[in-house]
């Protein structure tokens, strides 16, 4: 973009001529890219299993052949040449969202979730889907199929040190969490990227997409759309809804960016459009479940969804670490919708710990929704760190943490213990840190509860009085004809090879490329063009902001009316949020038994238990866990064969048990440490030196942590002894 001068330059005739020639050439080249896009769209949609994976894949399990068939499939990603896969590392399974687009975005390029996992030495699998649903398939059927897929992956990797790490992007995130709630034993760490789980949450004045369901009267329109599709919901409507959130980009910026950089931008543009235009379909019943139970009903975090056999889906059942990746720049899944389910389920961090849950979150400052799982920069930073440090995340003590990434610089201590360009540390957080991102107050929740009631009423009215007529009138050929006329499909087809008006474009574009004469960057008319483009964007942005403001205002006025809330039976006297999860009395009883068992076992064990307990006691004073400390533990295991006897799962269980002992009765847990130690002072000294080596890997201990280390030294009976150092950093990786 040329620099603007405070005094406009008057264009000469030469400026006008060169600009006009360039603009004409750009227009033809732009049309040629549109032609290529149309041809690519037709070729892509004609495939049996279209996807945008940048990797070769082998079919492992076809969901259409299961007892309850679905259009999903499990494939193995074939590692590219030169990639080294470690059979002992846990496999990664990437689940792509079925939100209107086709599968493959998680492996769209080398710098992707799949790419960084392969780079870190993990075997990779991908769960994708076909464009057409199996007749009658439901969300529950898909959940059951994904359980079978994970069982298959586990069986294929018997030597792996842990269960698969599962990544759920966008709408696949809630699907993964539902399955993990029902079958927690199938999961290693879970990474959910840009995934909404608390659907009413948000900040006033921002993220207005959550109001759309209420302003449309609820989910009756979803039912109507499915009926007009003869039982099929067209995913193109979901894509259009996404585009409507950013009219400036949809109507102008995306196309203008191509036009203004047509000599260099075509490849990137076509690569993205290949995925963006690959619209898929859902059964109407699937979409109705998603809208009623999740986006309008907000029942997932509240534990109000049940399977067909009566099992309640409770996310507190999940025992694997949950990594939540979201962004303040994401207007589709803002931080509140990605994180407030934690507040819906738990009243405190102690309650998170009591359920044995480990939750790690990281919030990007500005990346948009698609960038969370498409951006190469995000893949090289956040996803690369998650993949490289997945074992560290897996063994974190229960609690709430924020993953903080710090660049490796010259001032960083022990950089040889860092695997990449960033240091990841997990810092302890409280629920107030989640609340600080903003969210609903009680009045907001009541408004959304009222909107959910109105949705139920309108849906019942539609099903009673209109649905029989619509279903009787719409035939499958009529539905297919309406789908083919969808504006998002027409914008591809009108420029495609089927349009005879476009026949001359390819040849003309070839001639222009041979005689290309781009305009000079300092041409004043080019500066005027850029200025006009900014004005168009500003105008569309102003329109968006006005519509969003009015939408929020009307939603608050309509559903905040006391008379309407009273008529709908909304309780305005209680202080309890309408969708807060109920407490489980059985869990309290089990917890009491567990506490008693922990107290009884405090003096049982040996040097392992003593070291783990001491490590946690000192580390808790720091309030964070650093990847350098975990790497030091790994090197100690390599240096001392006897330490290798513990698998990662056993090490995780050891750390959790010792952590809970400290939580239950810290004084008694510390007092029992001497009973766990060997009698020989040399062995105690070597063990303490190893402990100090791990604790000081991120840097010297200070303050309370240093005082605690001295207390541990006394417990080891070494107050007058100088520990023998273990030079673990000299051990080869």
Curated annotation (Swiss-Prot):
<dbReference type="GO" id="GO:0016020">
    <property type="term" value="C:membrane"/>
</dbReference>
<keyword id="KW-0472">Membrane</keyword>
<dbReference type="InterPro" id="IPR024501">
    <property type="entry name" value="DUF3141"/>
</dbReference>
<keyword id="KW-1133">Transmembrane helix</keyword>
<keyword id="KW-0812">Transmembrane</keyword>
<dbReference type="InterPro" id="IPR029058">
    <property type="entry name" value="AB_hydrolase_fold"/>
</dbReference>
<feature type="transmembrane region" description="Helical">
    <location>
        <begin position="174"/>
        <end position="194"/>
    </location>
</feature>
<dbReference type="InterPro" id="IPR051321">
    <property type="entry name" value="PHA/PHB_synthase"/>
</dbReference>
<protein>
    <recommendedName>
        <fullName>Uncharacterized protein in ackA 5'region</fullName>
    </recommendedName>
</protein>
<dbReference type="Pfam" id="PF11339">
    <property type="entry name" value="DUF3141"/>
</dbReference>
